[in-house]
């Protein structure tokens, strides 16, 4: 319910909240970046508050993007390791649909998904965009994904995790 979410965001900010978070899935099965959600991103931009993607328990049918038939519901370790993929998919959809061009002051935060993966993802996102620059691409971006990330995105890092300190140094110092 985008209209309801937009109203709730405005109410919460008027009550003192400084941002909001969304689950890494949608009940409509439309990705976060889809234009159907533009009213919410526009309201966040208008209110000058960030929106974060935060993990949470996902309904069974939504969680299973499973390629393997032998891993059932008893594979909780496996599914927990892959939990960040839902957050990544939601994150990537903002680029796929050009949200950062439509809302140049919109701020997006990625929470609780580690940060060690973001460098490789930005490299890949930029490379794929460049390789598709012949007009046949489906990515409607005016700039490189890494440019939008540096300007409009933040990611939480846990310096106790193996990859995050290296990523932290690269993003902060580089």
Regions found by a protein language model. Give the residues of each.
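Catalytic pocket-lining loop regions of alpha/beta-barrel enzymes
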Residues: 2-4, 9-174
